[in-house]
Curated annotation (Swiss-Prot):
Annotated spans, Disordered: 11-30
Pfam families: Ribosomal_L27 (PF01016)
InterPro entries linked to this entry: Ribosomal_bL27 (IPR001684), Ribosomal_bL27_CS (IPR018261)
Superkingdom as given in the UniProt entry: Bacteria
Residues cleaved off as propeptide: 1-10
Keyword vocabulary terms for this entry: Ribonucleoprotein, Ribosomal protein
Entry similarity comment: Belongs to the bacterial ribosomal protein bL27 family.
Cross-referenced Gene3D superfamilies: 2.40.50.100
A biological process from GO: translation
Family annotation (NCBIfam families): L27
Post-translational modification: The N-terminus is cleaved by ribosomal processing cysteine protease Prp.
GO CC terms of this entry: cytosolic large ribosomal subunit
Protein name (database record): Large ribosomal subunit protein bL27
Organism from which the protein derives: Natranaerobius thermophilus (strain ATCC BAA-1301 / DSM 18059 / JW/NM-WN-LF)
């Protein structure tokens, strides 16, 4: 009579499991960089955005990633156009008369 034994050994300690959490993407630093009433120089970034939450107005350009920037020196103003649309303009400061 032959006796076959099937022996299976288990681990003495449970291995440490890996978590599926613990990752996060880096922030994109979006938002308004220069607020209404602030002085800007040509080329300064006014708003970093995804899509056109704010539309470019007078003396404001738009980059390929929808970033709004000043085309001229002046003061930033945020304007409401209609019910939904917001526009950013840069108006040059009037020269002081002496």
């Amino acid at each position: 009579m032959e006796l076959k034994m099937n022996l299976q050994l288990f681990a003495q300690k449970k291995g440490t499991g890996s978590s599926k959490n613990g990752r996060d993407s880096i922030s994109k630093r979006l938002g308004v960089k220069r607020h209404g009433g602030q002085q800007v120089n040509a080329g300064n970034i006014i708003v970093r955005q995804r899509g056109t939450k704010f539309h470019p107005g007078e003396n404001v350009g738009i980059g390929k990633d929808d970033t709004l920037f000043a085309k001229a020196d002046g003061v930033v103003t945020f304007e409401q156009v209609g019910k939904k649309k917001k526009r950013v303009c840069v108006y040059p400061e009037p020269a002081m008369a002496e």
